[in-house]
Amino acid sequence: MTRFVGCIDLHDGKVKQIVGGTLSSKPDGEAPVTNFVSDKSPSHYAHLYASNDVQGSHVIRLGQSNDEAALMALQAAPGFLQLGGGVTKDNCQYWLQWASKVIVTSALFDSDGSFQLQRLREISGLCGRARLVVDLSCRRASDGASWTVMMNKWQTPTTLALNEETLALLSEYCSEFLIHAADVEGLCRGIDEELVAQLGLWAAQLRGDVRVVYAGGANSVADLGLVKRLSGGRVDLTYGSALDIFGGSLVRFQDCCAWNRQQ
């Protein structure tokens, strides 16, 4: 059934909420649009999620200079949080010393955005399928009716389409998908209902142990019920800028935890 999943986004060593589409991979790129900068430590949020048993919550390193902050969060709740951002075949096992799973994205593609299945096979072999999440964050394609997987902080389109065939193929090597709708991420203007419904249809065809998590635009605790209805309970939901723990005024963290307890 649809559950609330927590996130801890790290940027420049601090817990932040950023409008996802404004991140840049260029050293001289413009500063991202930031909704919230926390005065609390990453470990504070790790304890918060762990003490409320918000399973599947993740830490994402958005750019450089976040290793120390990521370790602080992971070591505050060993084996509880997932870790994403800059995960490669060379460091995945290092992070799995403290993370429950690692999340991989750009490492699966060449610099031009061409998907490399062999890279996924290699990382899956190192981590184990059960401890690997593939991030298929996406933008709507120019036709308006399909989605393209993005990499490099959602700035670079890849050759991979987000569809049933892609999920079926990749699920042989991972146990979970994390999908940010980059077009609406951080805007608090509502979820991409069409994408959530499609994810539910595609998830129904996957192995029973595969989890699908959607992120982007959620602005009400009622969105949990909406995602449950649209996806048939096959897709989980994460909140960011709308949450009170991230300075938001639209969604109470404890209401989301109460939803999980009721499911």
From Swiss-Prot:
Catalytic reaction list: 1-(5-phospho-beta-D-ribosyl)-5-[(5-phospho-beta-D-ribosylamino)methylideneamino]imidazole-4-carboxamide = 5-[(5-phospho-1-deoxy-D-ribulos-1-ylimino)methylamino]-1-(5-phospho-beta-D-ribosyl)imidazole-4-carboxamide
GO CC terms in record: cytoplasm
Pathway: Amino-acid biosynthesis; L-histidine biosynthesis; L-histidine from 5-phospho-alpha-D-ribose 1-diphosphate: step 4/9
Pfam families referenced in this protein's UniProt entry, alphabetically: His_biosynth (PF00977)
One BP annotation, GO: L-histidine biosynthetic process
Keywords: Amino-acid biosynthesis, Cytoplasm, Histidine biosynthesis, Isomerase
Cellular localisation: Cytoplasm
GO molecular function annotation: 1-(5-phosphoribosyl)-5-[(5-phosphoribosylamino)methylideneamino]imidazole-4-carboxamide isomerase activity
Domain of life: Eukaryota
InterPro entries per UniProt: Aldolase_TIM, His6-like_euk, His_biosynth, Isoase_HisA-like, RibuloseP-bd_barrel
EC number: 5.3.1.16
Family: Belongs to the HisA/HisF family.
Name of the featured protein: 1-(5-phosphoribosyl)-5-[(5-phosphoribosylamino)methylideneamino] imidazole-4-carboxamide isomerase
Originating species: Eremothecium gossypii (strain ATCC 10895 / CBS 109.51 / FGSC 9923 / NRRL Y-1056) (Yeast)
Name of encoding gene: HIS6
